[in-house]
Amino acid sequence: MGPGPPAAGAAPSPRPLSLVARLSYAVGHFLNDLCASMWFTYLLLYLHSVRAYSSRGAGLLLLLGQVADGLCTPLVGYEADRAASCCARYGPRKAWHLVGTVCVLLSFPFIFSPCLGCGAATPEWAALLYYGPFIVIFQFGWASTQISHLSLIPELVTNDHEKVELTALRYAFTVVANITVYGAAWLLLHLQGSSRVEPTQDISISDQLGGQDVPVFRNLSLLVVGVGAVFSLLFHLGTRERRRPHAEEPGEHTPLLAPATAQPLLLWKHWLREPAFYQVGILYMTTRLIVNLSQTYMAMYLTYSLHLPKKFIATIPLVMYLSGFLSSFLMKPINKCIGRNMTYFSGLLVILAFAAWVALAEGLGVAVYAAAVLLGAGCATILVTSLAMTADLIGPHTNSGAFVYGSMSFLDKVANGLAVMAIQSLHPCPSELCCRACVSFYHWAMVAVTGGVGVAAALCLCSLLLWPTRLRRWDRDARP
């Protein structure tokens, strides 16, 4: 809910943030963005292709991370609100951000490093148990940093224009983070991978991922946490959380009756009885499935189905992200011209075109760059539009907006983890690093996560066209 008109004698509005303060805030999520890019793009590839763990084992670890993230996100938000009176001098939000940052810094490098104390005779289940606690700690830290950083926006600024500006700066550094990860991955694969090739060794062997690439991913994770730690330090040095006033006690001039509001409040229990809540929620979930699963399985598709050199696991995701970033600038004018639903549908058409291209083409070759442009543009279109649809659904009911976002976030994270586990369970050679069946498996997995889920998203969109989102009026004094 936006601020009302200033009352007589009210304190003046806070001064706008300086450019340094705005930039300091914007870099506070840089570490999370770096880690998230590496987590979704390279975790399965590292565990299965480099560490030679079974496909089910790799999928189980990713599922553990997604479930831990989904559970920690609402719990951290609840505890952060409860602890608002703690750490008053430093700021409760910054304190939670610091806790999350430390957890991420201490746990993330171990996820992309060999199991300490494990040998050739160590059973796989023991290695998976070793990685499990580090993944849970990382996801707890990631959620703590994300929630505290987002909740700082209304603490730092009150003007809607400044809120949009902070969000835009935050997204700009997200772009920089993804470019940094993919650029560093390409550089490490190019330099460190080629330096290990002996003069008598076939050059094609150096283009295949394997145990020799463990230092590449270990160094990439160390680079990620090193750079992220510097930006997190800049955030804590340059961001000052404003002190919250204590709960206001009723005074002499406080009206006994609250003024009537034009719009009744929607509580969390009311959302559960709104069909539109489930319509938009399922659409958002399918959108996230397309975006995250295509990012997760793109590296596997490039490696096993197209047999491309390993540098492509860095260059193709980079092309996808740049394509999506550039296409996001077209979202506002397109939305104005054809509306939310048709904008989302246009993005789906682009993704379905990519899926059809992959399904029908025997080998893409260099054309994989053009396909990556299509997928990146389509994913950015449906993701931005689905977020706008969620904001439209909440509308003026911001008092329960956190419940809506939290519910949809929990649903999409758990669904992503379960989907990955299901795909990994169908892997034709779970006990081998790769076999002939992998070629067609990852080919059709890529078609399924884009085309198959895209069809499901189209059906959800049709339900919104047939039954537009309309919220009923609820009497907050009425019993549910």
From Swiss-Prot:
Tissue expression? Widely expressed, with high expression in primary melanocytes.
Effect of substituting T73A: Does not affect phosphorylation by MTOR
GO annotation terms (biological process):
carbohydrate transport; cysteine transmembrane transport; melanin biosynthetic process; negative regulation of melanin biosynthetic process; pigment metabolic process involved in pigmentation; regulation of melanin biosynthetic process
Q: Which UniProt keywords apply?
A: Acetylation, Amino-acid transport, Lysosome, Melanin biosynthesis, Membrane, Phosphoprotein, Transmembrane, Transmembrane helix, Transport
Q: For the modification N-acetylmethionine, which residues carry it? A: M1
What are the GO MF terms of this UniProt record? cysteine transmembrane transporter activity; symporter activity
Which reaction equation describes what this protein catalyses?
Answer: L-cysteine(in) = L-cysteine(out)
Q: Which residues lie on this side of the membrane: Lumenal?
A: 48-56, 119-124, 192-218, 303-310, 424-446
Q: Provide the topology term for how it sits in the membrane.
A: Multi-pass membrane protein
Transmembrane stretches in the record are 27-47, 57-77, 98-118, 125-145, 171-191, 219-239, 280-302, 311-331, 348-368, 369-389, 403-423, 447-467
Residue numbers of Phosphothreonine PTMs: T254
InterPro entries the UniProt entry points to: MFS_2, MFS_trans_sf
Main localization of the protein? Answer: membrane
In terms of Gene3D superfamilies, this protein maps to: MFS general substrate transporter like domains (1.20.1250.20)
Family classification? Belongs to the major facilitator superfamily.
Name by which UniProt lists this protein: Major facilitator superfamily domain-containing protein 12
Species name: Homo sapiens
From the UniProt record, report the name of the gene that encodes this protein.
Answer: MFSD12
